[in-house]
Amino acid sequence: MAENQEVYDVTIIGGGPIGLFTAFYCGMRELKTKVIEFLPKLGGKVSLFFPEKIIRDIGGIPGIAGKQLIEQLKEQAATFDPDIVLNQRVTGFERLDDGTIVLTGSEGEKHYTRTVILACGMGTLEVNEFDSEDAARYAGKNLHYGVEKLDAFKDKRVVISGGGDTAVDWANELEPIAASVAVVHRREEFGGMESSVTKMKQSSVRVLTPYRLEQLNGDEERIKSVTVCHTESSQREDIEIDELIINHGFKIDLGPMKEWGLEIEEGRVKADRHMRTNLPGVFVAGDAAFYESKLRLIAGGFTEGPTAVNSAKAYLDPKAENMAMYSTHHKKLVHK
């Protein structure tokens, strides 16, 4: 290791909601912290794809827009001044003789740390684009893979293709403001929360199941209508639209982390109840983690992050108490 090289107590890979809250809790445990984020801004997939989505699965918060949640998490994380590195993918992992971990960035940057917490979701995300020659031409015009501003869809005829929780949530959010909303899903059953699906079906949203999006019809600039096809009868229908939203999931890749020697199960990093991985000094939290009865909610990740931090603290200092630290009495927060 080079002389005078700065070594961090914890380096968090991932600057999404879980990474940000984990950084805050590292400060609570007086750990020198760095956060490395692959994207050019903090917030992970919430900032990238769901800034306008209302998040309702956090205790004490009836509902909050994704972008607002990220702003509050950034403010909270900044309490203890963690170092933030953006627009950098971690590609290399090695351990020096003294136990220091060296993380290598995509451009050869070196990051020295005593422990690592993986809060990178399921890896890098790339939307599954609609398989059509015309899709690229209309993307960014009136074909969307995310909803950045709800108001952009006000008084518009909107078709949403997809059946997961995000597609259902978008339908419910847009229904009060759009001229019309139709949801096209290739299966009869939806993957969203039961209450959200019920709300959608009881609203004015037109639900077409089991149908698939087949064709985009338009001119050089915009889609004018879409053709949908019944998956069983092959019956087709053209629907006139102003805006098309496609939510067909993501391509997810753990990338180079798969080569680090981590135990992987179902595309995630296997963890014990202390959020420890099989590699000493490496911990995991949020969607990146796999263990039995894992709860895939932001609220669950907000518990796993502090658990990983406490385990990292105990790894660095076996005499340290492996317990929750109450922010109520923390000297840096008590006068806020």
Task: List each language-model region with its residue ranges.
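A Rossmann-like FAD-binding core segment of flavoenzymes
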Residues: 6, 74-105, 110-113, 175-271, ...
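Residue-level detector of alpha-helix initiation sites
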Residues: 12, 16-18, 41, 124, ...
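Glycine-rich FAD pyrophosphate-binding loop
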Residues: 28-47, 182-191
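Conserved N-terminal glycine-rich FAD pyrophosphate-binding loop of Rossmann-like flavoproteins
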Residues: 40-64, 193-196, 201
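Rossmann-like NAD(P)H-binding beta-loop-alpha module
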Residues: 154-177
